[in-house]
Regions:
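Glycine-rich beta-strand-to-loop/alpha-helix junction loops that act as flexible
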Residues: 106-111, 180-183, 301-312
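ATP-binding/phosphotransfer module of carbohydrate and carboxylate kinases, centering on a glycine-rich
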Residues: 1-100, 218-366
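Conserved phosphate-binding catalytic cores of ATP/NTP-utilizing and phosphoryl-transfer enzymes
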Residues: 11, 18-20, 24-32, 139-176
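Active-site nucleophile and cofactor-binding loops and adjacent substrate-binding regions
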Residues: 72, 119-122, 141-148, 167-171, ...
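Glycine-rich phosphate-binding loop of actin/hexokinase-like ATP-binding domains
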Residues: 163-167, 171-232, 315-316, 323-328, ...
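Short coil/turn connectors at secondary-structure junctions
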Residues: 34-35, 136-138, 172-176, 185, ...
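A glycine- and small-aliphatic-rich helix-loop capping segment at beta-alpha/alpha-beta transitions
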Residues: 54-59, 120-125, 156-164, 192-200, ...
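Short beta-strand-loop/turn "lid" adjacent to the catalytic site in phosphate-handling enzymes
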Residues: 91-142, 151-160, 312-316
């Protein structure tokens, strides 16, 4: 799964100061305003880890002091990556902190069950106890990955997004939909408010796939041979793009020669494989239709932020595809959607910033 319903969990070391820590929040004692701590954003392909500190006077809630991106398949688990990251601090101005880090916020697709973060798209299980004990972490809090990303979008500067669909007027004040295809299909909704915004994590990627034309009906029939429930994530993800390509090769009566989502994307952009081009066209059309549905469902008048590893690579293709027409094609709601812009974010450190900012906000008295 790309992500599941909102889960917050804090694992505390057995010390009196942490006795009040429990699932559902950060607990009795978070990091002080100027106390550096670890924050990680873990996806199925990459994990991004940062050393952060609160920055109440800045445009974002935290400053990132040190940052590194890891390829998940190159490591045996998140604990090993965190140990490596802390080891890297030896060569930085923050070397003295290596033995002083007591708090960690993790944004991760999945949900917490007992000691583990459970998600089928991660290449390995994540043990909360292993992280806590291996690094001497007194407190580890887990937030859904797209929940963290949505939290961070409120701190985006104007130049940090690129238009997919522009509107004549500025977006209205209201909920912002944040979603994107990666290893899975994640989504969350930012709900503006005071004194602070709230975020609704969703299971939207698991909604049943709704074909919009005869070709998509044929594809759905092929997908249903594997299982009765076919979700949007089954098509709108890296693995989903590969499945679309395989299905279209079968419908075209041609062999499937491309073996990875990256190969399908490259062939589609180069125009060297007809089935790959059609697969990416179907992908973009389904994405536009689904995004439009979610805007209506959540009343996302504040706009849409698209994220995900594949989207920056295909942005010109996406703009030229049927994405916009499928997005607007909601009958009497077309005029409504024409007032809701869609923009692309290349999130980089945003998941780390979102997890860390949420962690600070959840401190008692924050």
């Amino acid at each position: 799964m790309g992500e599941v319903a909102k889960q917050r969990h804090a694992a505390a070391a057995p010390a009196p100061a942490e006795a009040g820590t429990a699932a559902g929040g950060v607990g009795a004692s978070g990091p002080g305003p100027q106390q550096p701590f670890l924050a990680a954003d873990v996806g199925g392909t990459h994990a991004r880890i940062g050393l952060v500190v609160g920055n109440a006077a800045g445009p974002r809630p935290v400053s990132v002091l040190h940052y590194h991106r890891y390829h998940c398949l190159d490591w045996p688990g998140l604990a090993a990556m965190l140990r490596d990251f802390v080891g890297q601090l030896a060569g930085t101005p923050h070397a003295a902190l290596r033995g002083e880090l007591r708090h960690c916020a993790v944004a991760c697709a999945g949900y917490v069950l007992d000691d583990a973060i459970v998600n089928g798209n991660l290449p390995w299980p994540v043990s909360i106890r292993e992280i806590r004990d291996g690094l001497g972490i007194g407190q580890l809090a887990v937030i859904n990955d797209f929940e963290a990303l949505a939290y961070a979008t409120q701190f985006l500067a104007a130049g940090e997004t690129r238009p997919v669909i522009d509107t004549a007027a500025a977006p209205a004040e209201g909920p912002v939909l944040v979603m994107g295809p990666g290893t899975g299909l994640g989504s969350a909704v930012l709900l503006p408010g005071r004194p602070r915004a709230q975020v609704l994590a969703t299971e939207a990627g698991q909604v049943s796939l709704a074909p919009g034309n005869e070709r998509e009906i044929e594809i759905l029939r092929l997908f249903r041979r594997e299982r009765a429930h076919v979700s949007f994530e089954d098509a709108l993800s890296g693995p989903g793009l590969l499945k679309l390509y395989a299905a279209l090769c079968e419908l075209r009566g041609s062999p499937a020669q491309l073996l990875t989502p990256a190969e399908v994307t490259a062939a589609a952009l180069a125009g060297s494989d007809g089935a790959a081009v059609e697969a990416l066209e179907v992908f973009c059309g389904l994405l536009g239709s689904f995004v439009g549905d979610l805007v209506l469902l959540y009343g996302a008048r504040g706009g849409v932020c698209l994220a995900g590893g594949i989207l920056p690579q295909i942005l010109p293709f996406l703009r030229a595809s049927t994405f916009a027409e499928r997005y607007f094609n909601k009958g009497v709601m077309r005029a409504y959607l024409q007032q809701v812009p869609v923009r692309l974010i290349e999130h980089g450190q945003l998941g780390v910033i979102g997890a860390a900012g949420w962690f600070l906000d959840e401190r008692p008295g924050a």
